[in-house]
UniProtKB/Swiss-Prot annotation:
Localization per Swiss-Prot or TrEMBL: Secreted
Uppermost EC category: lyase
Catalytic residues, chain numbering: R266
Signal sequence segment: 1-31
InterPro entries associated with the record: Pec_lyase, Pectin_lyas_fold, Pectin_lyase_fold/virulence, PEL
Protein's recorded name: Pectate lyase D
Listed GO CC annotations: extracellular region
Pathway(s) this gene product operates in, as recorded in its UniProt entry: Glycan metabolism; pectin degradation; 2-dehydro-3-deoxy-D-gluconate from pectin: step 2/5
A GO biological process held by the record: pectin catabolic process
Cofactors named for this entry: Ca(2+)
MF terms (GO), sorted A to Z: metal ion binding; pectate lyase activity
Organism per entry: Dickeya chrysanthemi (Pectobacterium chrysanthemi)
Co-factor binding details: Binds 1 Ca(2+) ion per subunit.
């Protein structure tokens, strides 16, 4: 009799604990919609093709508010593709406060996969990620808005003979994915800038890779009103000269109303893709002691770029190979297909950028857009309104 009573009480206690835990998890994750911006769809650029809505159709049970990595992972719910809105209300340390100890450890814990039909949006200026990467891989219909992502620091860079130390891990990755909108996102080296690198075996111990990679047949992507700052190898579109079978005809990306501030190169560098960049602001200095400006547009194998009404404020530009100093903005690797209309270089209207490539790029774009005439006041407005906390 006593044993039965004890067993009954134990079962009852266990059931109560399970119910309490379930209720606690539910109350932590489920939330009301804190901003109608979370239900907006991409309105211009390549991401409009087919429609990029993210989690706009999320049921009330799939709307979350998260403030730490445990809550964030629970809200993502693995590969669940039901529409979901994840509102980030605090600074999320992807490492969970536990330092990475090796390459394998960092790979296992720092790469956070984002499923299809998801909107991740920061609330106010609280939505931040450090010590990891947001990985959009093999999915479609994803929106990132109003977020700050600090570029991860590789704890175990690998050495390549003739090329020195190289790092893995980007702040964000779009890999074999379609219909992605990145809006009002800031990506920066933040608290660990490149001047903090040490040396190892007599060479610079590089611990940053890219800010954003778009690769492996990804398509229909728009990057808008975002800020990329304090970084070296910023945006790579198309990861390999030998990946044409997957990339050709894809990697179509629009950049508009973004700011690239004190970044060295790759804004972007493109292989195989078709890039449309309009009304962006580029700020840099060839003589910057930490992030010296090299170039903005990198034309890799079969890459094409249309530049319209952008603003370049770049100090100490130099003539390269006898060309106008402005031509350092466009670096030719294995492609020369490029056109520019109406951009300003150091405040002056110029058509000289068009002389920096051999073949003009005159695409027929399937979406509507309005490239505003670039002026100093427009450049200032774009600079003031780009990045997280400005939505």
């Amino acid at each position: 009799m006593n044993n039965t009573r004890v067993s009954f009480r134990s079962t009852k206690s266990l059931l109560a604990a399970i119910i309490a835990t379930s209720m606690m998890t539910w109350s932590v994750n489920r939330a009301t919609l804190q901003t109608t911006k979370a239900t907006e769809a991409a309105s211009t650029g390549w991401a409009t093709q087919g429609g990029t809505t993210g989690g706009a159709k999320a049921a009330s049970a799939k709307i979350y508010a998260v403030k730490n990595i445990s809550e964030f992972k629970a809200a993502l719910n693995g590969t669940d593709t039901d529409p979901k809105i994840i509102q980030v209300t605090g600074a999320i340390d992807i490492s969970g406060g536990k330092a990475y100890t090796s390459f394998d450890d960092q790979k296992a814990r720092s790469q956070i996969s984002v499923p299809s039909n998801t909107t991740i949006i920061g609330i106010g200026s609280n939505g931040k990620f450090t010590n990891g990467s947001l990985v959009i891989k093999g999915v479609s219909n994803v929106i990132l808005r109003n977020l700050y992502i600090e570029t991860p620091v590789d704890v175990a860079p690998h050495y390549e003979e003739g090329d020195g130390w190289n790092a893995e891990w980007d702040a964000a990755v779009i890999d074999n994915s379609t219909r992605v909108w990145v809006d009002h996102v800031t990506i920066s080296d933040g608290s660990f800038t490149d001047d903090k690198y040490t040396t190892k075996n007599g060479e610079k111990y590089v611990q940053h890779d890219g800010a954003l990679d778009i690769k492996k047949g990804s398509d229909y992507v728009t990057i808008s009103s975002s800020r990329f700052e304090l970084h070296d190898k910023t945006i790579l579109i198309g990861h390999s000269d030998s990946n044409g079978s997957q990339d050709s005809g894809k990697l179509r990306v629009t950049f508009h109303n973004n700011v690239f501030d004190r970044v060295t190169e790759r804004t972007p560098r493109v292989r195989f893709g078709s890039i449309h960049a309009y009304n962006n602001v580029y700020l840099g200095d060839v003589k910057n002691s930490v992030y010296p400006y090299l170039y903005s547009f990198g034309l890799g194998t079969s890459g094409t770029i249309l530049s319209e009404s952008n603003s370049f404020t770049l100090s100490n530009l130099k003539s390269i190979d006898g060309k106008n100093p402005e031509c350092s903005i466009v670096k030719q690797f294995n492609s020369k297909v490029f056109s520019d209309n109406g951009s300003l270089v150091n405040g002056s209207s110029t058509t000289k950028l068009d002389t920096c490539a051999v073949t003009a790029y005159k695409p027929t774009l399937p979406y509507k857009y309005s490239a505003q005439t670039m002026t100093s006041s427009l450049a200032s407005s774009i600079n003031s309104n780009a990045g997280y906390g400005k939505l």
